[in-house]
Amino acid sequence: MFMQVWYRGMLSQLKLGVAICLVTIICLPALADSVGPAVVAKADQNLWQGAINTADGFNLASRATLLVYALALQDMQKLSDAEMLAAFKIKSINRTSVEKWLVKEFGLTLLNYQRASANCVVSDWTCVGNVPTTDDFLKKAADGIAKTPQQLLAWRVNINGFSHAYVAEQLRLAALFPKVSSEIDLFNDKEWNGDNVADRQFFLSFDDGPTGIQGTTDDTLNMLTAENKSAVFFVLGEHLQSRLSKSDAAALTGLYKNQCVASHGWEHQSHAKWDQWQNSITRTQTLLNATLPKDNVLLLFRPPYGQRKDDSGTFFQSQSLHVALWNIDSQDWNGHVDVNDITNRMITLMLIKRHGVLLFHDVHPKAKVALPIIFAKLNNAVEWENCHQMALLK
């Protein structure tokens, strides 16, 4: 509880952006509305002193993390428009979108805690009893956090900082939506972001490839083969064409063997603003179909930055495409985030989200190092789904 009081007190003295920087995260240069957050949430999973490689261990850590996260969400809910404008360095706030996201996130957080608590025992400090509503959960979460064991107080402070920073990331996206579209919300029932994946089930996805021959795309695919995992690779048409010009379709078929490939558009441009966005999609889909076996190609499109037009649903339906977003972002493209940051961030978010679609980029080398560590730490606690199942998401 003292962290809530401390954090709220800091807001009366400092701008939110400065306050967030004081709680175990980093400050980055101010960025444009359409790019990334000015602050990236970081965590240190080494402060959690239990194994998370079994279902019971994962659920225990998930319950504890969700107790902290729920209170941080409640705290951040109190931010005024003026505080958000100053902290997020944006020009306007869509309060309706913010409130919609908060309601949804509180609901998901409650559901995730209920799932994590299915086999709770009274003696466990993370088990706060029956919580049928969000209000019940928030009241009991405060009591539960007060019982944090002494040896986990440093962990609690760290996760509190992470949670405030992560909620700030999401509030920023919600505040901008739909003026700047993103993964934070959906326009129609032909879009999904991973929130409806089953409990403790996760999908891997990679954007922006392929790289040149023997580049990080090849390294990433070799890693997945060694780990017996599959992923969906959302490729840029111009990168695929460039790679094809230096090899052939047979080589690319071998490269993506046992994996899935889908469209990221022809160029990495906002498909909400680009007047050639439809051609970008049809051109890329034509190249995919001409290059790779039908079984490898999924009828999915992932818009760069998650940006697409609010009225694009009819077009995607005419192309038999679903818009495939994500709900767990590694931020691996960010130069201020290293492999250790990614590993800790993704595990923490998996404990909070408990299911979904993980976003990485195979044009950067960090994921190929971070993922084997994540696989080892989680072991059999979660299920990594076959990439072909992503085509069935709704």
Predicted regions span which residues?
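Short amphipathic alpha-helix initiation/capping segments at coil-to-helix junctions
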Residues: 335, 339, 364-367
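Short, flexible, glycine/charge-rich loop motifs used to bind or transfer phosphoryl groups or to couple energy/partner
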Residues: 192-194, 251, 291, 346-349
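Terminal accessory/targeting
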Residues: 2-203, 215, 222-231, 354-394
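Metal-dependent polysaccharide deacetylase catalytic core of the NodB/CE4 family, i.e.
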Residues: 133-157, 162-165, 200-202, 212-214, ...
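A short, acidic, amphipathic alpha-helical segment used as a generic capping/interface helix at domain edges
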Residues: 339-351
